[in-house]
Regions:
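Bacterial N-terminal signal peptides
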Residues: 2-13
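Surface-exposed patches in mature extracellular/periplasmic domains of secreted proteins
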Residues: 43-47, 118, 142, 171, ...
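Short acidic alpha-helix initiation/capping motifs at coil-to-helix transition points
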Residues: 176-177, 360
Length: 513
């Protein structure tokens, strides 16, 4: 039950005059400049669509650290998981045309599709692919595609080895690889690749001429923003993630100029001018709650953001804010973060793309939402910075405990050379540990970026020092057989703030020779 205090929060400060919400906030440009400085992000591009009109499509800051080239509305960003709504829109078109149904079994179209249990495999539907209720753990299979040379088909095939962490359809756990499988249904039905279907059925009709289906689709002259992250306390340029091998989950590259067109067709229930891309009924389906998401209490500075409901729909998340339903999604890859937000009953859409890693896109989204919903302004920059400080303090406390547990006085159970060798994990594949210059070096055989020196931590535990600086380090824990040989090694992320795509905990490497 919603208490009176909560209702007071929802309706607090509705003071803007009638008509004010048809315009952008005053001093918005100055507010964006302040946010860029506060969050240490080089640049952002923002689009706002209201009542069928593009109120804003503009860049702020710069495209690259150390370069004065200004950000603009045509700069390209990786939009990461904002791609998922494009994939479900493609499937919705096929539902409209009678080519498939959301509740069709996946194996009807992908006969080789297989998961951890024969019954689950048989019962698994297209809807299950796109609603994060598979029974697999959070981010299951992400290390199969992250910086790897596996093809999309091989990534999907290897998921049969992923172990469940809950019952099928019992709880929410975000999964990227299953969206790649959803995308593979499109060529099975139409003969067109996911990439070509997106181009023909969405990008071309909407005139989204600046949007690319992945890194391989980039063309000479494309204005791609540079990715940035804070490493070792300093803002640095980081390599672009190439995620074409799970394209339907995360690979689209776009600008706010193009995404304003995408938001407009969403808010008009699939209609673009006189042409309809998908039906109003499919819009309702894609925006309907499918999998309940757990609601956690936010940090105190963000208490007002605690929703009354939260769920995953079809390629979108849905929740409430100040009495309105939000349809939204975020996207994040190395050095680039973004968010798309729709408020259907206000015919409002907001897109924020950034070339850094921070909650800047959240702060600016809520500033714009408050303005257009007629709420009293809040300092969302300060609120999200306070929350981030709290998260870092908690993580630092946990890391401090871990560091104090390091025991380099303990002796290794085996000579270093006995830990070296070739290992295999049923899900990921092969890895090698080599003895080089008196130390151990771990290599993931299908992920060239994952090469790391193993630093002894104590008690047959090592910590990776990946040579690619923006990868999340992991503990490598060896288990020995009674006779003294290595039985296996497992891994887990060092930092509590590590992105869930570093699903080291799912790996169990055993000697393969």
């Amino acid at each position: 039950m919603v208490g009176l205090a909560s209702l007071g929060l929802v309706f607090e400060g509705l003071v803007a005059p009638v008509g004010a919400q048809a315009r952008l906030p005053t001093r918005f440009d100055a507010d964006v400049a302040r946010a860029l400085r506060a969050f240490n992000v080089p640049g952002t591009a923002i689009a706002v669509v209201k009542d069928g009109k593009v109120l804003l499509a503009k860049g702020y800051g710069v495209q690259r650290l150390g370069d004065r080239t200004p950000m603009n509305a045509h700069a390209l960003f990786q939009i990461a998981s904002n791609t998922k709504a494009f994939t479900t829109a493609c499937l919705a078109m096929l539902v409209d045309s009678g080519k498939l149904a959301w509740d069709d079994p996946v194996t009807r179209y992908l006969p080789d599709f297989q998961l951890y249990d024969p019954w689950v495999t048989r019962e698994f539907t297209i809807r299950d692919l796109v609603t994060h209720r598979s029974g697999l753990g959070l981010g299951a299979g992400d290390l199969l595609w992250l910086h790897s040379n596996y093809t999309r088909r091989e990534v999907i095939r290897r998921m049969r080895a992923a172990r469940p962490t809950s019952s099928f359809r019992s709880q929410y756990a975000y999964d990227n690889v299953l969206y790649a499988a959803a995308g593979e249904i499109i060529p099975a039905v139409t003969g067109l690749s996911w990439e070509e279907f997106v181009r023909q059925r969405i990008l071309a009709p909407l005139g989204m001429t600046q949007t690319r289906t992945g890194v391989a689709d980039l063309r000479p002259g494309d204005r791609l923003a540079t990715a940035h992250a804070v490493l070792g306390g300093r803002l640095r340029i980081v390599p672009l993630d190439t995620v074409d091998n799970i394209g339907p989950a995360a690979s689209l590259i776009s600008s706010v100029t193009d995404l304003a067109k995408w938001v407009s067709v969403q808010l008009d229930s699939g209609r673009a001018g006189k042409r309809r891309l998908w039906s109003a009924g499919q819009t309702r389906e894609m925006w309907s709650s499918q999998t309940i998401m757990p609601i956690k209490d936010p940090r105190p500075s963000l208490a007002i953001l605690r929703p009354n409901f939260a769920a995953y729909a079809l390629g979108w998340r849905v929740r409430d804010y100040r009495g309105h339903k939000l349809v939204h999604h975020t996207g994040g890859l190395a050095g680039m973060t973004s968010k798309t937000t729709l408020v259907p009953d206000k015919r409002l859409g907001i897109v924020i793309l950034t070339n850094g890693e921070s909650s800047l896109y959240e702060a600016l989204t809520y500033q714009l939402l408050d303005h257009f919903l007629g709420a009293r302004p809040r300092d969302w920059v300060a609120a999200f910075q306070a929350a981030a400080r709290g998260e870092r303090a908690s993580a630092d406390s946990e890391l401090g405990i871990v560091r104090r547990m390091r025991d380099t006085t303990s002796r290794l159970s085996l000579p270093l050379a006995r830990y070296a060798g070739r290992y295999s994990d049923e899900l990921y594949g092969d890895a090698t540990i080599d003895l080089e210059d008196g130390g151990l070096v771990l290599r993931f055989s299908h992920s060239p970026a994952f090469v790391g020196d193993l630093v002894y931590w104590g008690h047959d535990i090592f910590r990776t020092n990946w040579r690619t600086p923006n990868l999340e380090d992991a503990f490598v824990v060896f288990t020995l057989k009674p006779e003294g040989a290595v039985e296996q090694f497992t891994m887990e992320a060092v930092s509590p703030l590590a992105d869930f795509s570093y699903d080291y905990q799912d790996l169990r490497f055993v000697p393969s020779r």
